[in-house]
């Protein structure tokens, strides 16, 4: 891995030397997409690290969003994400009445929401899974849904995707006249994952949360398909040292 880290640091240094670069992405993740393009990586949805076994994460210096670690669907039975959608989604008036489902929740308490259903996690060591719990706010009672993520699947995703991670900070500039966006990539920090057991403990403590997003396509031809159909595990930048060890790269020679 040392040689891969050296290659990554060299490529990042060359990217830094470019200064401000044109945005080649779109949406809230455009800085990350632009960086991946500069590294020669094309967009994909594969659960694999981005570059030589190292996952790339990009964060704008002005962003307050948590870092999205990895995505994994509920897996104890088939088609659970669609079943969750059918049960919990609602009509969104600002999107022309199309249905949506989104929330952010952890293992400490049910998500604070005015909607019908609230979510929470429970780490079940006996069954080796992370259970999704559901509460009906209107009827004031828990709902039995039997949905969960297996330890096996979560550990596999975590270790393959995030054994090593690089966090890059970026600055954004928008030309007021042309609306053209550019990014400057400022610094890079390399991390090594501690363990899956640590991941589970941070879930229990509410330090790692889950972001749920399910949005269907707006056009009539694809209304039965989703732009997003995922649950993503997230952590704040401040809490990264709880899950990862920072790798000292000060002695790495770039040549």
Task: Name each region found by the language model.
Residues 1-52, 58-255:
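Nucleic-acid endonuclease domains
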């Amino acid at each position: 891995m040392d040689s891969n880290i050296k290659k990554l640091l060299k490529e990042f240094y060359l990217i830094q030397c470019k200064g401000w670069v044109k945005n080649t992405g779109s949406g809230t993740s455009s800085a990350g997409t632009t960086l991946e393009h500069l590294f020669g990586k094309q967009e994909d949805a594969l659960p694999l690290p981005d570059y030589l076994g190292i996952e790339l994460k990009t964060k704008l210096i002005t962003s307050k969003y948590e870092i999205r670690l990895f995505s994994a669907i509920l897996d104890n039975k088939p088609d659970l994400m669609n079943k969750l959608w059918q049960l919990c989604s609602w009509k969104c008036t600002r999107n022309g009445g199309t249905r949506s489902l989104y929330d952010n929740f952890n293992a400490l308490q049910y998500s604070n929401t005015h909607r019908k259903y609230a979510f929470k996690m429970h780490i079940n060591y006996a069954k080796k899974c992370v259970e999704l719990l559901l509460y009906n706010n209107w009827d004031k009672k828990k709902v039995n849904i039997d949905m969960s993520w297996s330890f096996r699947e979560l550990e596999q995703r975590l270790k393959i995707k995030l054994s090593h991670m690089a966090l890059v900070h970026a600055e954004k500039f928008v030309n007021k006249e042309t609306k053209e966006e550019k990014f400057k990539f400022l610094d890079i920090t390399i991390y090594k994952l501690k363990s899956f057991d640590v991941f589970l403990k941070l879930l229990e403590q509410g330090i790692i949360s889950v972001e749920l997003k399910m949005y269907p396509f707006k056009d009539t031809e694809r209304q039965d398909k989703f732009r997003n159909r995922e649950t993503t595990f997230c952590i704040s930048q401040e809490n990264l040292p709880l899950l990862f060890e920072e790798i000292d790269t000060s002695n790495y020679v770039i040549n």
